[in-house]
From Swiss-Prot:
<feature type="region of interest" description="Disordered">
    <location>
        <begin position="1"/>
        <end position="29"/>
    </location>
</feature>
<dbReference type="GO" id="GO:0046872">
    <property type="term" value="F:metal ion binding"/>
</dbReference>
<dbReference type="InterPro" id="IPR010255">
    <property type="entry name" value="Haem_peroxidase_sf"/>
</dbReference>
<dbReference type="GO" id="GO:0020037">
    <property type="term" value="F:heme binding"/>
</dbReference>
<keyword id="KW-0376">Hydrogen peroxide</keyword>
<comment type="subunit">
    <text>Homodimer.</text>
</comment>
<feature type="active site" description="Proton acceptor">
    <location>
        <position position="123"/>
    </location>
</feature>
<dbReference type="GO" id="GO:0006979">
    <property type="term" value="P:response to oxidative stress"/>
</dbReference>
<keyword id="KW-0556">Organic radical</keyword>
<feature type="cross-link" description="Tryptophyl-tyrosyl-methioninium (Trp-Tyr) (with M-275)">
    <location>
        <begin position="122"/>
        <end position="249"/>
    </location>
</feature>
<dbReference type="InterPro" id="IPR019794">
    <property type="entry name" value="Peroxidases_AS"/>
</dbReference>
<dbReference type="InterPro" id="IPR000763">
    <property type="entry name" value="Catalase_peroxidase"/>
</dbReference>
<comment type="similarity">
    <text>Belongs to the peroxidase family. Peroxidase/catalase subfamily.</text>
</comment>
<feature type="cross-link" description="Tryptophyl-tyrosyl-methioninium (Tyr-Met) (with W-122)">
    <location>
        <begin position="249"/>
        <end position="275"/>
    </location>
</feature>
<keyword id="KW-0575">Peroxidase</keyword>
<feature type="compositionally biased region" description="Basic residues">
    <location>
        <begin position="7"/>
        <end position="23"/>
    </location>
</feature>
<protein>
    <recommendedName>
        <fullName>Catalase-peroxidase</fullName>
        <ecNumber>1.11.1.21</ecNumber>
    </recommendedName>
</protein>
Length: 754
């Protein structure tokens, strides 16, 4: 939980973001508000769009984000190459200088911006959740709604404005995503912590993400019972990792604003686990985050203006204008809680645990009316000084989440060790901070810069380096051995697909590299059909063992899928080359944190026409979810579905959607028959349909909703019609191979990106 935590804001403090702009008098030549100029025909506010008219329509927008039309950078711009030209040492020096270069428009507490910068970085990284890999700091998304206007992010707009001169100076070589995390890390370094390291590589996006589900609430900080299915505080709705809308983790005043440290401890444990933190890391991050900086609540709610997205144009993207006195310094308003945690809030020390363990604590209200814990008795010299006048001292504070660190038995035991062993605490925190700020950056192969730690950490999903090469002749020889092994096209394609489909473009985890499909837990996932998988792996392992030179099983799995596809295309009369680039390694079980891979388990896969069970979300929506996480477009999704069906890759060998009499041949039959008006569809059970001859009624095929959506949705049908055309049979094969290759290489960060 970050310093100066703004996660406890109530609606009484910061209202729901409406349009706060007041009506301005019109000039004589202005059109009255009740009229709309003819030239304003664009739907510029998002009102009355198609989804307003048909709210249940399938929304394909999540597949069409972050394209060239929204990106101001030149074609061919490569951020990784640009970052490698950055003078990182100079940036770090500038950040160290910034920490104590207080600006009159937003003065630094005690003359040091460290606490503010840490909170900014924390709240950027802290949105990450392991369930779907979304959120986090790797895209610089804190610049955009809703995050730039969350109640928990009050006044972080000022932190980013303070960084603007540095961003402006280093330009394209330094993304906002990298700068935000580096600023937080340098803040700790400037206050005395020996940091673990820093890696660049966060490439900025240029508009808000459309795919991230932040919750169903329509009100900031709505009661947390919206997110829990029962009284059990472990039942937080998946994939969410915050207890209320607009918070990063927990409400530090207590559950729904009601102080109870033991109840809050349950929320802390659940939310931190949702981002893959264990109990020791949780205590370290909580304590380390609150060793420096302060909370701000020395104002009244009615004096605070709207958030950035609701503020007037003259605010220029800033929000929460404070009309209380100067509105800054000791009168700053952020979370509603008021005070610092430690005696020396601008230096790294063990003061947090000293405060917790050496005082009794009682509940009080801040000037803004927020619950906070204050010491019953405290020596004057142990109190932190005022942010403006060092001759004035104030009581330190603790949030309900801080009290959980000594009230929860497990947390208390960890806290006691950290108190006894400050060096150990600093070491654990430094590594936990690195994990927090790099968890969504992907494997170590994506890390950039001279400060990357040498140590391999298990949460980075390490893969051994590859020390072999394969010639074209050797690749051909391996293909021939695989095709002559007795394995079918379906078996080879299914195994390669299952190995690669775990890739998530959100946090760059999963994929075929590493061949973790042969390890726990993946080898026993029902979606991977363990019996079929074991059969295929045994054959490929035999080929691997008897080949004349080293080759990874990861490469053989992908090569086998590609060889099978080339054969299936040739059986249909089309010769095609399925690109294959060796270089994948084989991870070991010791390199694999089995528990951390559980969220990657496919419990649905429309590409293989499979659901582990019935879900409240429709099958076609689940298909979009998987497609978006895999980084695929709607046309790529369409061509892959059509190809996978005719190749006979359905889970369990079902025939739903297999609209062909030539199973195993890569053809466009799926689209030809789907769009043929000689057939008529009718329901035949739960998520099942029959296609029959329109004249005789004879049943020809069966299908699921995932199959039929490519004929019913107007956008998807337009793609299906392209691939059904007589002149696009070869195009279908080419496009299928291109999309397939993209999936197989999604986690090959060693390859050039084009």
């Amino acid at each position: 939980m970050g310093t100066q935590p703004a996660r406890k804001l109530r609606n009484r403090v910061f209202p729901h973001p409406h349009n706060h702009r007041k009506e301005k008098p019109m000039a004589n030549d202005q059109v009255p508000a009740s009229k709309c100029p003819v030239m304003h025909g664009a739907n510029t506010t998002g009102q009355n769009g198609n989804l307003n008219w048909w709210p249940n329509a399938l929304n394909l927008d999540i597949l069409h984000q972050h394209d060239r039309k929204t990106n101001p950078m030149d074609d061919g711009f490569n951020y990784a190459e640009a970052f490698q030209q950055l003078d990182l040492a100079a940036v770090k020096q500038d950040l160290h200088h910034l920490m104590t270069d207080s600006q009159s428009w937003w003065p630094a507490d005690w003359g040091h911006y460290g606490g503010l910068m840490i909170r900014m970085a924390w709240h950027a990284a802290g949105t990450y959740r392991i369930a779907d890999g979304r959120g986090g700091a790797a895209t610089g998304n804190q610049r955009f709604a809703p995050l730039n206007s969350w109640p928990d992010n009050v006044n972080l707009d000022k932190a980013r404005r303070l960084l603007w001169p540095i961003k402006k100076k280093y330009g394209n070589k330094l993304s906002w995503g990298d700068l935000i995390i580096l600023a937080g890390t340098m803040a700790y370094e400037s206050m005395g912590l020996k940091v673990y390291g820093f890696a660049g590589g966060r490439e900025d996006i240029w508009h808000p993400e459309k795919d991230i589900y932040w919750g169903a609430e329509k009100e900031w900080l709505a009661s947390s019972d919206h997110r829990y299915g029962s009284e059990d505080r472990e039942s937080l709705e998946n994939p969410l990792a915050a207890v209320q809308m607009g918070l990063i983790y927990v409400n530090p005043e207590g559950v729904d604003g009601h102080p109870d440290p033991l109840c809050t401890a349950q929320d802390v444990r659940t939310t931190f686990a949702r981002m893959a933190m264990n109990d020791e890391e949780t205590v370290a991050l909580t304590a380390g985050g609150h060793t420096v900086g302060k909370c701000h609540g020395n104002s009244k709610a009615e004096l605070i203006g709207p958030e950035p997205e609701g503020a007037d144009v003259v605010e220029q993207g800033l929000g929460w204008h404070n009309q209380n006195g100067k509105g800054v310094g000791r009168e700053t308003m952020s979370s509603g809680i008021e005070g610092a945690w430690t005696t020396h809030p601008t230096q790294w020390d063990n003061g947090y645990f000293y405060m917790l363990f050496n005082h009794e604590w009682e509940l009080k209200k801040s000037p803004a009316g927020a619950w906070q814990w204050e010491p019953v008795n405290i020596k004057e010299e142990d109190k932190p000084v005022d942010v403006e006048d060092p001759n004035i001292r104030h009581n330190p504070i603790m949030t309900d989440a801080d009290m959980a660190m000594i009230k929860d038995p497990i947390y208390r035991q960890i806290s006691e060790r950290f108190y006894r062993e400050p060096d150990y605490f600093a070491e654990v925190f430094a590594k936990a901070w690195f994990k927090l700020t790099h968890r969504d950056l992907g494997p170590k192969s994506r890390y950039l810069g001279p400060d990357v730690p040498q140590e391999d950490l298990i949460w980075q999903d390490p893969i051994p380096p590859v020390d072999y090469t394969l010639s074209e002749g050797e690749i051909k020889e391996l293909e021939q051995q695989i095709l002559a092994s007795g394995l079918t096209v379906s078996e080879l394609v299914c195994t390669a697909w299952d190995s690669a489909r775990t890739f998530r473009s959100s946090d760059y985890r999963g994929g075929a590299n590493g061949a973790r499909i042969r390890l726990e837990p993946q080898k026993n996932w029902p979606g991977n059909e363990p019996t079929r998988l074991a059969k295929v792996l045994a054959v490929l392992e035999n080929i691997q063992a008897n080949f004349a030179k080293p080759v990874s099983l990861a490469d053989l799995i992908v090569l086998g899928g590609g060889a099978a596809i080339a054969k299936a295309a040739l059986d249909g009369g089309i010769e095609v080359n399925v690109p294959f680039l060796p270089g994948r390694g084989d991870a070991t079980q010791a390199m694999t944190d089995a528990e951390s891979f559980t969220p990657l388990e496919p419990i649905h896969d429309g590409y293989r026409n499979w659901l582990k069970q019935d879900y409240a979300v429709s099958p076609e929506e689940l298909l979009l979810e998987r497609t978006q996480l895999m980084g695929l477009t709607a046309p790529e999704m369409t061509v892959l579905i059509g190809g996978m069906r005719v190749l006979g890759t359905n889970h369990g060998g079902t025939k739903h959607g297999v609209f062909t009499d030539r199973v195993g041949v890569l053809s466009n039959d799926f689209f030809v028959n789907l769009t043929d008006m000689a057939y008529q569809w009718r329901p035949a059970g739960n998520n099942l349909y029959e296609i029959g001859d329109r004249q005789t009624g004879e049943v020809k095929w069966t299908a699921t909703k995932v199959d039929l959506v490519f004929g019913s949705n107007s956008i998807l049908r337009s793609y299906a019609e392209v691939y059904a055309q007589d002149d696009n049979r070869e195009k279908f094969v080419r496009d299928f191979v291109a999309a397939w290759t993209k999936v197989m290489n999604a986690d090959r960060f060693d390859l050039p990106r084009g």
